[in-house]
Swiss-Prot record:
Protein keywords: GTP-binding, Initiation factor, Nucleotide-binding, Protein biosynthesis
Keyword tRNA-binding: no
Chain positions covered by the region annotation G2: 44-48
Family, per entry: Belongs to the TRAFAC class translation factor GTPase superfamily. Classic translation factor GTPase family. IF-2 subfamily.
Database matches in PROSITE patterns: G_TR_2 (PS51722)
Protein name: Probable translation initiation factor IF-2
GO cellular component terms, semicolon-separated: cytoplasm
GO molecular-function terms, A-Z: GTP binding; GTPase activity; translation initiation factor activity
UniProt: GTP binding residues: 19-26, 81-85, 135-138
Keyword 4Fe-4S assigned: no
This protein's encoding gene: infB
Length: 597
């Protein structure tokens, strides 16, 4: 990295646009691109692979009076086109975020949504400066559109009612930013952008407020990031893989954003791979053909070199195991081993902590894998294996080895189930969860675990002897023995058929026999609850000798069952069962304080 800050060596700041699905990220990028193309003459935009480069002259044309181009020596802005399904967290560079600055798009009517919260978390974690684009101002009831105008000029044309409704929504968003720990205000009221987040009201459809957004982005980049934009224009290129794609005639290619130095055709490069760094040689550097030539048979044209900052498609052998989000390094005049170690070191920063038992995690890129691992750690969900890529048969085989049923699960973020893994999954005892929102994915898994644990507890509850205390009613002896049949009232707990029963003599439990039948109003039943009166048949005792009318009897609880009831199922049993259990344990523990512990 050089210390130069002359215009020749200042690169274009990299801008990422992120936000909740349907809040208008794509429309905003399309509007910025479209307006830039329509301004045309002043130095039309360059469409890169995975990015759009808008030069300062074009921004100046679009922003009109808001910008004086002589105030700037940065060359323009490079907007990264992160498709809706791509998490911003994919964009890493040297341990931080690839983007120098971000635009968080929020629907002015909806405010913060799940993916907004997720984006805010990532921005906070990576320390990326950002502005908020409060989109869809044109949907405010009674709005009078002023196409392409700066927002304050547009506001002058609105009725008091429309402006007041918009302000209400804007201050709702400013409040939500405050709740997330960020001080924010409408951008023209912000005195210090290092301490406060600027909110830019705009419409991606009418273009209102878009000049303001470009002005704020240029101003922030020029003021606070100029030194970081200084690059060694001839140095070995450094970049980040956006996506790995198969292209006809080229095989596996990597869409890459170059953020430092220069990449040339024929360069030897090192790329982060799924198993180990890939050392290969560039066969072709590809850029999209200009828009007017897009209908030609060839989508791409070859270029000799690409300097930072730019998006480019790199074609080279052995790239099929390259990872989205991984580093790309040009070797040039250095030992290749040194560059391999550099890439390994960067990948090591993203190593996910795994446990001997846990779930399998798959994500589309290294950055999102890292974000998933962080979120799972916070949720205290252990990870057995974490990898980039779609879900393959071996992932299912690994998930099946988990010791606990709840860990026999795969959590996939922005990934697909490969065709050859579908049959495996159908035949395996493995649960698959996929989603495009990390927090939703984890919430679905946690709900599944809770339901599974509840079902297991219910199964245990079905097998365990339930506590009960009941009294033989006076004048309710229907048969004295073989079996004794008496009427009883259940005082607390649940009387179950086929259980041993008895009474306490001092602190000793005396078993008198086993229940062999329960009848309620003449019908056979399996159990009787607190407050019910039923007749029961007891094999073993004789009424008048072993038991008497008025006696209180208890269900005999095996010690192992008492321990499970007290330690694992206390919340699952009813209040009166807890009462019967507590009284039973209290009496048993007078003789042996450690009974059932």
């Amino acid at each position: 990295m050089t210390d130069h800050t002359n215009a020749d060596t200042l690169r274009t700041p990299i801008v990422a646009v992120l936000g909740h699905v349907d809040h208008g990220k794509t429309s905003l990028l399309d509007t910025i691109r479209g307006s830039a193309v329509s301004e045309g003459e002043a130095g039309a935009i360059t469409q890169h692979i995975g990015a759009t480069d808008i030069p300062l002259d074009t921004i100046s044309e679009m922003a009109g009076e808001l910008i004086d181009p002589t105030d700037f020596d940065l060359p323009g802005l490079l907007f990264i086109d992160t498709p809706g399904h791509h998490s911003f967290s994919t964009l890493r560079a040297r341990g931080g975020a690839l983007a120098d600055i971000a635009v968080l798009v929020v629907d002015v009517n909806d405010g913060f949504q799940p993916q907004t919260e997720e984006a805010i978390d990532i921005l906070r974690r990576t320390g990326t400066p950002f502005v908020v684009a409060a989109n869809k101002v044109d949907t405010t009831p009674g709005w009078n559109p002023q196409d392409g105008q700066p927002i304050q000029r547009s506001l002058e044309a609105q009725s008091e009612r429309a402006e007041s409704m918009l302000n209400e929504n804007l201050y709702e968003i400013i409040g939500q930013l405050s709740d997330a720990g960020f001080s924010a205000d409408l951008y023209w009221r912000v005195q210090d952008f290092q301490k406060n987040i600027g909110v830019v009201p705009l419409s991606a459809i009418t273009g209102e407020g878009v000049p303001d957004l470009l002005t704020v982005l240029m101003g922030l980049s020029q003021r606070f990031m100029k030194e970081e934009m200084a690059i060694d224009v001839q140095g070995p290129g450094e970049g980040t893989v956006l996506e790995v794609k198969d292209e006809r005639g080229f095989g596996a290619t990597i869409d890459t954003v170059v953020y430092d130095g220069v990449v040339r055709n024929g360069d030897q490069i090192v790329v982060g791979g799924q198993d180990e760094p890939i050392v290969t040689e560039i066969r072709a550097l590809l850029q999209p053909r200009p828009l007017e030539e897009i209908r030609t048979e060839k989508k791409f044209e070859k270029v000799a070199e690409v300097g930072a900052a730019a998006g480019v498609k790199i074609a080279a052998p052995d790239l099929d195991r390259a990872m989205a989000g991984a580093p790309v390094r040009v070797v040039r005049d250095r030992p290749v081993e040194e560059v391999v170690e550099e890439v390994k070191a960067e990948l090591a920063e993203i190593e996910v902590e795994t446990a001997e038992n846990g779930v399998v995690v798959k994500a589309d890129t290294l950055g999102s894998l890292e974000a998933m691992a962080n979120a799972l750690r916070e949720a205290e969900v252990p990870i057995l294996r974490a990898e980039v890529g779609d879900i393959a048969p071996r992932d299912i085989a690994v998930a099946e080895t988990a010791n606990q049923d709840e860990h026999k699960a795969i959590l996939g973020f922005n990934v697909d189930l490969l065709a050859n893994a579908e049959t495996e999954l159908e035949n395996a005892d493995v649960k698959l969860f996929t989603d495009e929102v990390i927090y939703q994915l984890i919430e679905d898994y946690e709900t599944y675990v809770e339901e599974k644990q509840r079902a297991q507890q219910e199964t245990v509850l079905d097998k365990v002897v339930r506590p009960s205390r009941f009294r033989i009613l006076p004048d309710h002896t229907f048969r004295q023995n073989d079996p004794a049949v008496v009427g009883v009232e259940v005082i607390s707990g649940t009387v179950q058929n086929n259980r041993n029963v008895g009474y306490f003599e001092g602190n000793e439990f005396e078993r008198v026999g086993q229940l062999s039948g329960i009848q309620k109003q003449g019908d056979d039943v399996d159990e009787a609850r607190a407050g019910e009166r039923v007749s029961i048949a007891i094999d073993g005792p004789t009424v008048g000798r072993d038991i008497e009318e008025g006696d209180t009897l208890w269900t005999e609880i095996p010690e192992k069952h008492a321990k499970i009831l007290e330690q694992e199922l206390k919340e699952e049993i009813t209040a009166d069962e807890r009462e019967a259990l507590a009284a039973y344990l209290e009496t048993k523990r007078k003789r042996d304080p450690f009974w059932g512990k």
